[in-house]
Regions:
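Hydrophobic transmembrane alpha-helices
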Residues: 104-108
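Acidic, serine/threonine-rich low-complexity disordered tracts
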Residues: 1-83, 109-190
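Acidic/charged, solvent-exposed loop-and-adjacent secondary-structure segments enriched in E/D, K/R, S/T
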Residues: 84-103
């Protein structure tokens, strides 16, 4: 199974974020490949090239690893579940330490992100407290298909964070198939 997401800027496809799922008995592996570039006047002003792998057993995360180049700067996350402490151990480019099990990897395939109070950055390992607000039901059209969705706003709990560190996303979720079908945020366009 797979989820293929186009990354758009001002309505134009600039890249992708694709998720591939493998399941066997009580285990699941999710691989993600993301690549996009934002260009202004022909010059690349923002870029992401990333690969990650998540592993779950009995629907519980026990391993996550990512390698990312964001604007040619290398970022990474190595996360493992520690059985004795019952915590995640994170070695990331922005955070090294423990995280509680109520944290979720901030990836767009997982609708459980709406229930979490904290997310772990899939690029750097930093932990961000979040607030999720249900805005209402909304019909949206994607690729000439209409969906009845639930529209959410996901924001950083800490309003004092610098803008480039804040979470600020609009998310449209299709409860019929438990899929996030659209994510929007403003950074150098929509």
């Amino acid at each position: 199974k797979k989820i293929e997401m186009d990354v758009l800027r001002n309505g134009e496809v600039i890249g992708y974020s694709n998720y591939f799922f493998e399941s066997a008995e009580n285990k699941m592996t999710v691989k993600n490949y993301t690549k996009f570039k934002v260009k202004l006047l022909g010059v690349t002003v923002f870029s992401v090239l990333s690969e990650s792998i998540e592993k779950y057993e009995n629907d519980k995360l026990f391993f996550f690893q990512s390698n990312t180049f964001q604007n040619d700067k290398e970022k990474f996350v190595n996360l493992k579940y520690n059985e004795s402490s019952k915590k995640f151990i994170i070695n990331g480019s922005s955070y090294k330490g423990e995280a509680s099990l109520d944290c979720i990897i901030g990836n767009w395939w997982n609708h459980k992100i709406f229930k979490a109070s904290k997310q772990i950055s899939p690029l750097s390992g930093s932990i961000k407290e979040q607030v999720v607000i249900f805005l209402g039901k909304e019909k949206i059209n994607i690729n000439n298909k209409e969906y009845l969705t639930e529209h959410y706003k996901l924001k950083s709990k800490d309003e004092s964070l610098p803008d480039d560190k804040k979470l600020n996303f609009d998310i449209w979720f299709n409860p019929e198939n438990n899929l996030i079908i659209k994510v929007s945020y403003s950074k150098m366009g929509n």
